[in-house]
Amino acid sequence: MGKVYVFDHPLIQHKLTYIRNENTGTKDFRDLVDEVASLMAFEITRDLPLKEVEVKTPVQTATSKVISGKKLGIVPILRAGLGMVDGMLKLIPAAKVGHVGLYRDPETLKPVEYYVKLPSDVEEREFIVVDPMLATGGSAVEAINSLKKRGARNIRFMCLVAAPEGVEELQKHHSDVDIYIAALDEKLNEKGYIVPGLGDAGDRLYGTK
């Protein structure tokens, strides 16, 4: 079973408070999401393997370390997931970026794939699927389905806030995927919104309320 990691770093929690605040405007909201995504990327890459290399400093030759053999990919779920990409790329600029687009079928209410673009070397990469919210879990499950159908083998999921129902749904369908969360909230309400949550992340990122 994949593990669930909830980041309690003070900076993440501090910034998340302002992300939640309904009075935070679009620009500040976007900047804060970018910053938290960067901090979370620092945590999620903590276990990357290292190898020793020789480097010549201005003083002498030294043995130092670099990341070994890991090809990373970031896959935002459109559109809200885009708000997390730049913050992650600040720390891992060599990562390739794919995209998964989903829409909700008006009759079945289930997510339907409408766009997928991934790096050509899918099988060689470890992917981090990102979306600010993990509510019902339907979009995350379908996005990871899309990656696995195309050959992805190593996948993680990262979000700002999650409901227990969404975590359970994702674990039920993809028990091999680790989940990284800034905050695990109380529940979903009758409309499927995370409580207390942060509202509609896409609308708040792009000013389309």
UniProtKB/Swiss-Prot annotation:
The reaction(s) this protein catalyses: UMP + diphosphate = 5-phospho-alpha-D-ribose 1-diphosphate + uracil
Name the EC number(s): 2.4.2.9
Gene Ontology MF: a single term? uracil phosphoribosyltransferase activity
Q: What cofactor requirement does the entry state?
A: Mg(2+)
Inhibition and activation profile: Allosterically activated by GTP.
Name of protein? Uracil phosphoribosyltransferase
User: Family per UniProt?
Assistant: Belongs to the UPRTase family.
The source's superkingdom equals: Bacteria
InterPro entries named among the record's database cross-references: PRibTrfase_dom, PRTase-like, Upp_B, UPRTase/APRTase, Ura_phspho_trans
Q: What does this protein do, in the record's words?
A: Catalyzes the conversion of uracil and 5-phospho-alpha-D-ribose 1-diphosphate (PRPP) to UMP and diphosphate.
Gene3D superfamilies to which the protein is assigned, alphabetical: 3.40.50.2020
User: For this protein, what does the record note about how its cofactor is bound?
Assistant: Binds 1 Mg(2+) ion per subunit. The magnesium is bound as Mg-PRPP.
| Pathway annotation | Pyrimidine metabolism; UMP biosynthesis via salvage pathway; UMP from uracil: step 1/1
> Which Gene Ontology biological process is one annotated for this entry?
uracil salvage
Q: Which residues does the record give as uracil binding sites? A: I194, G199, D200, A201
